[in-house]
Each structure stands twice: as C-alpha cells, then as structure tokens.
Amino acid sequence: MRVGIYYRHSFHQAIVQSTSRALQPQHDCLATSDTGELTRYRPHVIVAAEDLTYLHLRAHLPLSRFVHTRHGLANKGIPARSFRAADYVCVTSEAVRDDFLAQGIRPRRGYWITGYVQMDNLFSAPRPPQIPAGKKVVLYAPTWHDGLSSLPLLGSRVVDLLHAGRSDTFVVIKPHPLVQQGKDPKLAPWMQTLRAAARDRSDTYLIENRGEDVMPWLNAADVLVSDASSVQLEYLALDRPLVLIDNPEHVTSPHYDPNGMEWKWRDMGQRIGTADALPGAVSAALSNPRLGAERRAVYRERLFGNLLDGRSGERLARRVDQLAPEVASDAQLLAVSPIGHAVHTSLPYLRNASRAFKRLLRSA
C-alpha cells in the first residue's frame, strides 16, 4: 500500500519517526508537509499527527483511510472535533479509550490502542550534551495558548524563579514551537522575554530549535514545570515530580477543557497559582523526588497501562498492515484525484475570501 505520513509542522516529524521506520519495510511511504504533494501521491492510508479538520484533508483525499496519532495527550477541547474527522485514532490505553467513548467521542471506524508513538524513544534518549554533569535539571515547558500559558505570569523573572535560589540547578526552557516561531504578534514578546532572561546565563539553556524533540529533555529532567501542556502527561511515564502553574484566566480560554486529563488530574503535581510560589515548589520537588509519587502511579497506570515499551510505532504499523482488505483500489483513488486537485487549488482562494469577509464583518 501507499502510505502518506503527513506532518504539518517540523516538530511533528519527531512524533511520527518511529512509525515511519516501522512502516517503510512493508509499504511505499511518503513523508511530507505539502498537502499538494500528498494529494498527488494518492495514498491508500494517511497517518497524521495533525487535526485533520484544519486542512480539509478528507476533501483532498476522500477515499483514503485516515489514521490520527494525535500530537499531544492534552485535550484542550480538540478531540471532540479531530477524532470524528479520522477513521482511526491511536490512544494509549483501554482506560483512555473508554473515557472518550463515555464522552460520546468516536472516530469514524474505531480506536487503536497503540501507546503514544512520540514517546517511543523516551527512555532510550541520551542526555543532551548542553546539560552539565552534576546538576539538577529543571525543565520548563509551557504551552502556548493565551489564558493557559504560564509565560505571562513568570515574565522577566522566569529564570530566577525556576532556579529557586539554588546553586545546584540547571534550567532548561523548552517553549512551544509556535512560541519559538515568533510570527504571531501575541506570542513574539514571550520569546523575546525568554531570550533576555536567559542571555549570558551559563546555568540556563533556552531551546530555540522548533523541530527539537522534547523526549531527551524530559528524560534528563529532575523536575518538570509546566501549565496545561501535553508534556506534563508524557512526563508521568518517568515517575518524577511536577510543578503545575495555573494561569488565573484558564477558565476563560477556549482551549480550557475540564474533561481533559491536564485538568482532571491536576494533583499529578504541585499545583500553584502565583509566580512567587514557584521557587518553593521547585525546591520541594528537587529535595523529595517521591513527592506525589502515589498519585502519579495511579495516573501513569491509567494513561499508559503496559504500553511504555518503546514499540508504539510498531503496533501502529501492524494495524496499518491490516487495512489492506478495506482500502480503496488504485483505480478508485485515480478516479477521485481530480477532486483532490481542485480542492487543493481552490482552497487558498476560499480561505482568503473567508478572511476578507470576517474583516468586513468586524469593521461593520
């Protein structure tokens, strides 16, 4: 079969790398971020981390089977839309599948219990060379959504707060790739603040590479500081302490999802609501790595079960193998390809028209 592996952003490549390796021996694979190239390829199956609704991929390829790996484990209100657009959705455990079913969230054809493919290298990832020996590593990995991110709370004091007044710490700051990109005028000042705070600090490393795989940094961290990011759920696998910062405006954010594990399981770490509480929480976590371990163990089992063996990509590939009897024929894919080409050609114009109409409404 032809299998298209779609990544919208460069940082999605790390999510699908183990899946790509597992698929290539058995299938003709194309990994691309170009929807036009994907459409011309006419894949029988598409594996994508991205929410398919953003890009109208089904309109491009109406007969292809869509497999959604997710690009993070936090909900943020996305599964109700993105899961229903996919034929199959990969989840990390039976318990997680059952939670979504209880909420009435169903893919078109079913869930695949594979584990989370991005985490396949979590336990094997080497320690990044930027981290000096003998230091306790504090990893700060905030989300990017306005109202959820802790970046505005910490501001220019971010580095000093994370060091918690200790001399034995090395702080690593891993902004979300969309913050790193800096094109959004709402997000650009956050990156500028981080650069200024980390400048000339030998005890602090700011990750600037948008495509950087976060797994080696998670594996190296002694404590994770976050807010409502997916990394806090991935970090549960390592059984190390977390500090979670609540933005006071989180309940007003359109991405606040009280049904998401990022909020239902808030006691997975120390929960704080002010910047001034951060140093004490970080120091407590570093002094007692077993802090909160009992709750973390409960959530880790529910989230991952026994699927932390680094073989999630292989399990996904085996499920793709089994799709052969149900995929469209080459003749069928060829017959509908003019539809895909027409959609790909016209979509930019439709988007521009939609934006112009919205601007007109706002100015009226």
Which residues are covered by each model-predicted region?
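A generic structural motif
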Residues: 1, 23-31, 166-171, 202-204
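Active-site and donor-binding regions of nucleotide-sugar-utilizing enzymes
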Residues: 4-124
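Catalytic binding pocket for nucleotide-activated donors in carbohydrate/polymer assembly enzymes
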Residues: 108, 230-304
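Nucleotide-activated donor-binding/catalytic signature segment of Leloir-type glycosyltransferases, i.e.
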Residues: 187-210
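A donor-sugar binding/catalytic signature common to diverse glycosyltransferases
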Residues: 62-68, 211-254
